[in-house]
Amino acid sequence: MRRAAVLTAGSWGSVFAKVLADAGARVNLVARDPEIVRAVNTRQVNPRYLPAIQLPDRVRAMSDAGEALAGAEFVVLAVPSQALRSVLAGWAPLIGPDAVYVSLMKGVEVGSQLRMSEVITQVTGVSPDRIAVVSGPNLAPEIAAEQPAATVVASTSTSTAEAVQAACWTPYFRPYTNTDVIGCELGGAIKNVIALAAGMLEGMGFGTNSLASLMTRGLAETLRLGVALGADPMTFAGLAGLGDLVATCGSPLSRNRTFGEKLGRGLTLAQVEAEQQQVAEGVRSCRPLLAMADDLGVAMPITRQVERVLYEGLPPMEAVKDLMSREPGPEYRLRP
């Protein structure tokens, strides 16, 4: 029986623990909250994030990361992207030398501009061949309810990707493999920023044409930056690109879309952050993504306007006007 450790017991981490267990693994779920540990181990429920979902008996919760990581073949990392470096530094000495690292995170680190797999390598020294990235249209509540969904498992090592694929394949969760880690991680990070913009449109009362235009041009930004960084353009037409973008921009279950909707209704960044407890990754990722684009001479006008709304106090309606008043040009332009 496969053994996995999931760190930590947030919404997506808990759901992925369920997926792994339903696929046959024994799963240790790390939770800091003693109440979550008790509830999972006595009632198979995570009362904070998945109160209506019964977790499989093969999922056990614990607060001791060392205990959870002992003997784990797969170490699944599901923490806020900006916290990864600090928490992984403490966990790294506890992880076995042959374990595969599985990243569920969708963000870019502020300051370093590193993708999450790059942070894992930098902190642990592990080879990229032992890291897999899971990315796709994976809204946690729907997967928890066992609604059919697909995802991408990306690794520079085909055998690593296939091992993780086998470990998380269930009747309701279908993983595909890919070797384009750059494209899959960028797709997951940038779609959060575009989803903030999609939420702003919703909050301002705009309709389907506006949303479709935003999503399509947001995908163009993603493609341009991805190509400049060496990603495969086809990745962005797949689950980790278009698929994730559609789910995150279109669903009220999306944290980033919900966050953006509140901004579109007139709330400030500070007000929304005080009101919304769960992390909206696009809020922190937009600046390092813009820095990457600027370094490469890549135009990302939507991302730039989102950054202005978040950090310069630009009214969302003014951001729309600025985007629509830009000089028009050709639709397809991969290179700067």
Curated annotation (Swiss-Prot):
GO terms for cellular component: cytosol. Sn-glycerol 3-phosphate binds at residues 106, 136, 191, 244, 254-256. Pathway: Membrane lipid metabolism; glycerophospholipid metabolism. GO terms for molecular function: glycerol-3-phosphate dehydrogenase [NAD(P)+] activity; NAD binding. Belongs to the NAD-dependent glycerol-3-phosphate dehydrogenase family. PANTHER family: GLYCEROL-3-PHOSPHATE DEHYDROGENASE, GLYCEROL-3-PHOSPHATE DEHYDROGENASE [NAD(+)] 2, CHLOROPLASTIC. Catalyzes the reduction of the glycolytic intermediate dihydroxyacetone phosphate (DHAP) to sn-glycerol 3-phosphate (G3P), the key precursor for phospholipid synthesis. This is Glycerol-3-phosphate dehydrogenase [NAD(P)+]. It comes from Frankia casuarinae (strain DSM 45818 / CECT 9043 / HFP020203 / CcI3).
